[in-house]
Amino acid sequence: MAESMNKIFIAIIAIAVAAAATKMFTSEEPKSKALPVLVKGEYMQFPLVSIKKLNRNSAIYRFKLPTDEHVLGLPIGQHITIKAHIDGSEVVRSYTPISLDSEAKGYFELLIKSYEQGKISKMFTSLKIGDTIDVQGPKGFYEYTDRSSKHLAMIAGGSGLTPMYQIIKSIAENPKDKTKVTFIYGNVEEIDILLRDDLDKFAASKPGQITIHYLLDKPSENWKGGSGYVTPELMKEKLPAPADGVQLLVCGPLPMVSAIKRSAVALGFPKAKPVSKMNDQVFVF
C-alpha cells in the first residue's frame, strides 16, 4: 500500500514539473516597457532618418531614438525645444511632435512649415539624412488626458495645427475617450491644409464627436468649406459656448491668436492669461 502511494506521489510530482516546464518554454515573453528618452533640462542629439514632403513649404521629419524600445517621453500636448547655431548666434524654438509615444517606438516626427523669416524652420530645409538636431524637453503646461474636458473647442492656423493634431489623434485612437472636439483650422489656400487626410479620417472615426471646420483666406471657386477669418460670429456659430467642461485651445500666428483672445472674451470666455496653465478655460499654446 505504501509503495503504491509513493508511486502515485512521484507521478503527480512528475506531471507538475512537466507542466511547469511547458509553461516556461511556451509562454509569451512579457512585452518590454517603453523607455522615455528625454531628460528635463538636458539637450540630446537625434539623427534625421527620413523626410516626407507635404507641400511647397512643409514636410515631416523623422528622427531616430537610441533604440527601438525608446519613446520620446512627451506628454500629449507638450512640446520640445530645438537649439541651433545660425549665423553665429544661438537660436531656440519650440515644436510639438505629431507622433505619439503610444505608437512611435524608436523615433519621433516633426511637422515643419518653412517660413521666409524663420531661422530654425529654414534650417530644417537644409538638413540631410544623418544630420542631428539638439532637442530638450518635455516643456509646456498642457498635458492632455481623457478626463481633461468634456468638450474641446480648438482654433489653429497653419503649423499651429501640431498640438491639436496630437490631441485629436489620441482621442480618435482611444475607444474609451468620449471627449468632444470642435476644431476650426485656418489656412491661406487649400494646398496649405496640413495632414488633411488624417484629420478627415479622425473625424470619420468618431462622427458627431470629432468635428473639423476648414477655413481659407483665399479659397478657389470650387471650395466648399469656410472662407475669411476667424470672427466672433464664426466662433459663436461653430464652437461650444463657454461652460463647465468646455475648454478653448488656440495655436497659430500671433495676430490670429490676439484676435481670437479678444473674440473669446466678447463671447463670455475668461480673458486668457499671459502664460496659460492646464486648468485655464482658454489655453494658448
Swiss-Prot record:
Every FAD-binding FR-type domain range: 41-145
Q: Which pathway is it part of? A: Protein modification; peptidyl-diphthamide biosynthesis
Q: Which UniProt keywords apply?
A: FAD, Flavoprotein, Membrane, Mitochondrion, Mitochondrion outer membrane, NAD, Oxidoreductase, Transferase, Transmembrane, Transmembrane helix
Question: According to the UniProt record, which cysteines are disulfide-bonded?
Answer: none
Q: What is an example of a Pfam family matching this protein?
A: NAD_binding_1
Q: What residues bind FAD, as annotated?
A: 125-140, 151-183
Q: Can you say where in the cell this protein is located?
A: Mitochondrion outer membrane
Membrane spanning stretches: 8-25
Which EC numbers does the record give? Answer: 1.6.2.2
Enzyme class, top EC level, equals: oxidoreductase
MF (Gene Ontology) = cytochrome-b5 reductase activity, acting on NAD(P)H; NADH dehydrogenase activity; transferase activity
According to UniProt, the reaction catalysed is: 2 Fe(III)-[cytochrome b5] + NADH = 2 Fe(II)-[cytochrome b5] + NAD(+) + H(+); 2 Fe(3+)-[Dph3] + NADH = 2 Fe(2+)-[Dph3] + NAD(+) + H(+)
List the cofactors. FAD
The main location is: mitochondrion
Q: Which GO terms describe its biological process?
A: protein histidyl modification to diphthamide; tRNA wobble base 5-methoxycarbonylmethyl-2-thiouridinylation
Q: Which GO terms describe its cellular component?
A: endoplasmic reticulum; mitochondrial outer membrane; plasma membrane
Subunit-structure text: Monomer. Component of the 2-(3-amino-3-carboxypropyl)histidine synthase complex composed of DPH1, DPH2, DPH3 and a NADH-dependent reductase, predominantly CBR1.
State the protein's purpose.
NADH-dependent reductase for DPH3 and cytochrome b5. Required for the first step of diphthamide biosynthesis, a post-translational modification of histidine which occurs in elongation factor 2. DPH1 and DPH2 transfer a 3-amino-3-carboxypropyl (ACP) group from S-adenosyl-L-methionine (SAM) to a histidine residue, the reaction is assisted by a reduction system comprising DPH3 and a NADH-dependent reductase, predominantly CBR1. By reducing DPH3, also involved in the formation of the tRNA wobble base modification mcm5s 2U (5-methoxycarbonylmethyl-2-thiouridine), mediated by the elongator complex.
Similarity remark: Belongs to the flavoprotein pyridine nucleotide cytochrome reductase family.
> Could you identify this protein by its name?
NADH-cytochrome b5 reductase 1
Q: List the source organism.
A: Vanderwaltozyma polyspora (strain ATCC 22028 / DSM 70294 / BCRC 21397 / CBS 2163 / NBRC 10782 / NRRL Y-8283 / UCD 57-17)
The opening ranks of the lineage are: Eukaryota, Fungi, Dikarya, Ascomycota, Saccharomycotina
Q: What's the name of its gene?
A: CBR1
